[in-house]
Amino acid sequence: MSTESEARIQRIATLPFEKAGAPEGGLVSGIAPAVRDIWGHRALLDLLIRRELKARYKDSALGFVWSFIRPLTMLAIYYFAVGQVLGAARSVPQFAIYVFAGLTLWGLYNEVIAGGTTSILANAGLIKKVYVPRELFPLASLGSALFNFAVQFVVLLAAVVVLGQFPLSWNLLYVPVAVVLTVIYGLALGLFLSAVNVYLRDVQYLVEVALLILFWASPIVYSFGMVVDRAAARGQEWIVTLYQLNPMTDIILAFQKGIWRAGSETTTMADGTVVPPQPFPVDLDFRLLVLAVVGLALLLVAQRVFARLQGNFAQEI
C-alpha cells in the first residue's frame, strides 16, 4: 500500500462518525437535534433550492416567465369555463380575483406536497454518496415552491391594486396566517410522504390523484357560499361540516377573506343583481387556531416518522 493511501486512511480514521437516520430522543426531544443539524447545513439548503429552481427552467427560452404563464393560463381557463360558461361568476363578485387567490395558495400547497413526495428519490445519487440531513430535500422543495408562490402573489397584488380592490382592513392579516398554515400542512405531508415513497413507489401517483380530488373539494373555482346554499336547500347541513374537514377549506377561505375585498361587501353585479357578503364561517378565527395546533402536531409526528425511516434510504433507492 502506498504512503499516500496509508495517509488517507489515517486521515479518514480520525474523522467523527455521522449518524444517518438514527432518531435521537423521543417524540419531542428528538426534534432539537434534527433542527440543529438542518441549521448547520443551511448553506447547502440554499444551494439545493437554487439548483432546483435553475433545473426547472434549464434550457428554457422564457425561464422564470413560466412561473407567470402557467397560473395565468389556469386563471383564464377557469374564469371562462367555470365562471362564464357554467355561470359561477354570476354569484361571485370580482370572480377573477377570487379564483386567482385560490389558485395561488393552492399552487403553493400542491407544489410543496408533490415536490416533497419525490424529493428523496430525485436526489438518490447525492444521498448514496455523502451524508446530509435528509430533511433538506423536502425543505428544498418547499423553498422552490415559496419562490413560485411569491412570484404569483405579486401578480395577484398587482391585479387587486389595478382593479381598486386592495383590502385596507384588518382582514389583510388573514393572508400571512393562511400562508403559514399552508406551509405547515404542506411540509408535514411532504416529509411523511417523501419517506414512505422510498419504500412504496406507488405513493407518488396516489398523491397526484389525491391532490386533484382535494382541489375540487376546496373553494377555489366555486364559492363556499354555493356549498352552504346547496346544502341548506337539501336540508343536509352536515355536508358543510364534512366539507370543512378538509383543512385547506378554511385556510383558503382565510386567504380569500384577506385579499378578496368584494367577498366581505354587498356588491351590485353588472346585471343589477345584489350579492350579499360571502358567508365565511363565523368561527373562522377559532378554526384557524385549531388548525395551527393540529398542523404543528402533524409536523412533529411527520418529522419523527421521517427520522425513523431514513436509515435505509441509501439501500432502498
Which residue stretches match the model-derived regions?
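Hydrophobic transmembrane alpha-helices and immediately adjacent juxtamembrane helices
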Residues: 1-317
